Design a protein with these regions (language model features):
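Bacterial N-terminal signal peptides
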Residues: 9-19
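Short, basic/low-complexity N-terminal boundary segments at the transition from targeting/disordered tails
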Residues: 63-78
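Intrinsically disordered/low-complexity terminal segments and short unstructured peptides
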Residues: 9, 60, 76-78, 89
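Conserved, well-structured beta-alpha core segment at the onset of a catalytic domain
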Residues: 5, 17, 197
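Short linear motifs in intrinsically disordered
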Residues: 79-85
């Protein structure tokens, strides 16, 4: 056989071999995971923490879920009150559209934002983070973005299951439209909150209700079916969610209450994204939902939506909500606020 033909045959054989190998699951060796040196000391401290020992434990009764909820709300409320005090933000409970909300106002509302309004949908895997604890992300946005924010304290199981939370978000949005132009408003949230914000867009669009001028989608829980590379690559590396076997997966299914989790109102990545408002998405390189964020960003772009993606070094799931003194936290919200400023009318 001529030398050139032999080389071609060898390359073909190697190609077939590699293709066959790539079709199989890969096993990677155990290795240490260093804390990066080029992030803030605050983020380094978060990155270095071990995963919670009880990450794979969750209640198996409605009473157990309710107790977990009360405990989470109590600790989250303390965090929110202290954060609002540090950042000079006022938080006032009120009702919009029959739903309990909190009006979150910075001490230094930007002149350009006087007629603008943001609506925030809280995180918590659909079952945690209610009450005044629901205001943490709104407080950060108010302080660092200089916007007035309405934090939606939507209903959660075991008191109310899918689609109650979605109904509440849409009800607040429709109420907000009575006093503000849709182009003057944005909706944002993290994790389950981001998924609910997207689902609210589908519901509003289907009902002929105007959509906001922009969206902020932080580490969105966009796919409950388990699709996504980072569910494997960041398992046990993300020290917040930890893995799909952790708390958040059963919590989301508890909310779904037997409903098909591939429904776009639960897994919005499978919905029709065309015509949605401009969106900014946020994640971290260690986030278990990094792939959900990246895949959603690509699908938004493929659907003709103006979408921007920011990914932060070494962050696990939504760690920008955990320390208001970190420069990365300020940067996350300043980037989102800048995006909103470009897309909202005044």
């Amino acid at each position: 056989m001529p030398l050139l033909s032999m080389r071609a045959a060898t390359l073909l054989a190697l190609s077939v071999c590699f293709d066959s190998a790539n079709a199989q699951d890969r096993v990677v060796p155990a290795r240490p995971l260093p804390t990066p040196s080029d992030i803030s000391s605050g983020l380094q401290a978060l990155v270095a923490k071990p995963p919670p020992a009880d990450f794979s434990q969750w209640p198996n009764t409605s009473q157990g879920w309710a107790e977990r909820q009360r405990s989470s709300e109590a600790s989250g409320t303390k965090t929110a009150i202290a954060m609002a005090d540090r950042l000079h933000v006022t938080v006032t409970p009120m009702v919009m559209g029959g739903v309990r909300v909190f009006d979150v106002m910075p001490s230094d509302l930007a002149p350009a934002n006087r007629d603008r309004l943001l609506l925030q949908v809280h995180a918590g895997c659909y079952v945690l983070g209610g009450g005044e604890a629901s205001t943490v992300e709104a407080i950060l946005m108010a302080a660092f973005g200089h916007y007035r924010v309405i934090a939606i304290d939507y209903r959660m199981p075991p008191a109310a299951y899918f689609p109650a939370a979605l109904d509440d978000v849409v009800a607040v949005w429709q109420d907000a439209l009575k006093a503000h132009k849709p182009s003057q408003m944005a909706m944002f949230g993290t994790s389950a909150g981001a998924a609910l914000a997207l689902a609210a867009m589908f519901r509003a669009r289907d009902q002929g209700v105007p959509l906001p001028g922009a969206l902020g989608l932080g580490a969105p829980m966009a796919d409950l079916t388990g699709v996504g590379d980072s569910f494997a690559t960041n398992a046990m590396i993300d020290n917040v969610l930890v893995s799909r076997e952790g708390f958040c997966e059963p919590a989301a299914r508890f909310y779904a209450n037997g409903h098909d989790v591939a429904d776009p109102l639960l897994s919005p990545i499978y919905g029709n994204l065309a015509g949605l408002p401009p969106a900014i998405l946020t994640s971290g390189t260690r986030d278990l939902l990094l792939s959900s964020t990246v895949r959603l960003h690509r699908k938004l772009r493929q659907s003709g939506v103006n979408a921007q993606l920011q990914v932060f070094e070494a962050m696990s799931h939504a760690q920008y909500l955990r320390d208001d003194t970190m420069p990365e936290t300020r940067e996350v919200f300043e980037e989102i606020a800048s995006f909103f400023d470009r897309h909202l009318s005044k």
